Amino acid sequence: MRRLDRPRLRDAIKLSTDEKWSHYEGDDPSTIGWINPENAPSIEQINAKFQELNAAEPMRLLREERNRRIAETDWWASSDLLISDDQRKYRQALRDITKTADPQLNEFDELINVTWPEKP
């Protein structure tokens, strides 16, 4: 399964403030060089946003993979052929997976704890 980059500190900074910054090192908010430090968000605010982004990452990846799998079968629903009951159930199970799955990431940043429906 394709894996995109995890959220990074720059993502948390961008979502925490409109304040301009010039640099940072790694994922350490204490290294951020602010252009106007008196208007900068606190390290706690940036860390909170960073944790929020990381907590949402498994569900974001689940939706991305689900959308890819649905797109693979779009031709079923848009072709002149009649879609079978198994095909219809498969597509519905993919749409419903975000309601039932509790996705997590393993040490390799791969989705685990997800049972995908079998493609007919």
What do the PLM-derived regions correspond to, one by one?
Residues M1-P120:
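A preference for well-ordered globular domain cores
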